[in-house]
A protein has these predicted regions:
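An N-terminal structural lobe/cap that precedes and organizes the functional/catalytic core
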Residues: 1-73
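Conserved aromatic-histidine-acidic binding/catalytic patches
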Residues: 30, 97-104, 153, 157-161, ...
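Short coil/turn segments at secondary-structure boundaries
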Residues: 55-58, 128, 200
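Generic secondary-structure signature for well-ordered alpha-helical cores
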Residues: 48-51, 117, 121, 174-179, ...
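An internal, amphipathic alpha-helical element
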Residues: 131-205, 218
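Internal, conserved structured core segments that host functional sites
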Residues: 76-142
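Long, charge-rich low-complexity segments
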Residues: 206-226
Length: 226
């Protein structure tokens, strides 16, 4: 679609407008943002559009659309899908060896699990290897409660953080300010970093990882604007 507007503004309800008309989501709802900072950031994406609209250059708009349409339609179900990552959290699956990798995982992941234990009154079953280990029912329930408590926009921002790291604990630690984006990404990438150190990295894997890091960063930015 070609650009058809000249002026981008924000109305009193924090709805982004194009030549005075509200931007609408794919579900035809006005795109109303919950904070001035996010409204301005989304408006800036629309101001930056060239001759044609490219959704890939408007990731904050995309997450806002997700919050306003599919997540708002059934936030409990969406939150449950995110909370399910706690049942097979990356941090609970450790390498069997070599010792330096085991130690690196423990140094990064043990403090995060300890934080979650104290914050949410949960316990975790940790294993070596990739075979699934069931988490205590109380842990699953309490982590679910923690995620369901978030509003639609925070769920939208949390989604790429959790899905790209494979860790609900990392996502919760980040949104609560326990760790920053760089520490979160580093914790999630320990296994990949080890493989690169041992055997090198091909360009396709490097490109894919860079794309994932960018998408992860958008989620972090989105959360920071709320």
């Amino acid at each position: 679609m070609k650009r058809f507007w000249k002026d981008v503004a924000i109305d009193a309800d924090r709805v982004v407008t194009l030549d005075g008309k509200p931007v609408r989501t794919p579900g035809r709802r006005p795109l109303a943002l919950p904070s001035d900072a996010l409204a301005e950031a989304v408006a800036e994406e629309w101001r930056a559009v060239g001759e044609t609209i490219d959704p890939r250059t408007m990731p904050l708009t995309g997450l806002a659309n997700a919050a306003t349409d599919p997540i708002a339609n059934d936030p409990t179900q969406f939150a449950a899908r995110l909370a399910a990552y706690g049942e097979s959290d990356l941090l609970c699956y450790r390498a069997e060896g070599p010792p330096p990798l085991v130690e690196r995982q423990a140094a990064s992941w043990d403090p995060l699990l300890a934080w979650a234990r104290g914050r949410y009154d949960v316990t975790f079953a940790v294993t070596a290897g990739v075979m699934h280990v069931a988490q205590p029912a109380a842990t699953v329930a309490r982590l679910h409660e923690a995620v369901v408590a978030y509003d639609d926009f925070r769920l939208a921002g949390l989604s790429p953080v959790v899905t790209l790291t494979g860790s609900l604990v990392i996502g919760l630690a980040l949104i609560k300010g326990e760790i920053d984006a760089d520490a979160a990404w580093a914790a999630a990438g320990i296994d990949e970093d080890w493989s690169v150190e041992m055997w090198g990295e091909d360009w396709q894997a490097a490109e894919l990882r860079a794309l994932k890091r960018k998408e992860f960063g958008v989620g972090v930015e989105f959360l920071g604007l709320l």
